Curated annotation (Swiss-Prot):
Ranges of biased composition (kind: Basic residues): 1-10
Family assignment from sequence similarity: Belongs to the orthopoxvirus OPG052 family.
Gene name, Swiss-Prot/TrEMBL: OPG052
Organism encoding this protein: Vaccinia virus (strain L-IVP)
Name of the protein in question: Protein OPG052
Pfam families linked: Orthopox_F8 (PF05886)
Length: 65
């Protein structure tokens, strides 16, 4: 029982450390160096859950008649 509590605390500490800092827009040098890779967004699990939270009806594709 103590182990599960400890694990939960460490997970909460990780989430606190992963608070996104305000992103400065990349400088022209960085854009020239890395190209489009700055536009690639890393999704957090919460964002993925929100994206996948649509009702099944929307994603359901009815068979052609």
């Amino acid at each position: 029982m103590e182990g599960s509590k400890r694990r939960h605390d460490s997970r909460r500490l990780q989430q606190e450390q992963e608070q996104p800092r305000p992103r400065t827009p990349p400088s022209y040098e960085e854009i020239a160096k890395y190209g489009h890779s700055f536009n690639v967004k890393r999704f957090t699990n919460k964002e993925m859950c929100l994206k996948n939270d649509y009702p099944r009806i929307i994603s359901y594709n009815p068979p052609p008649k």
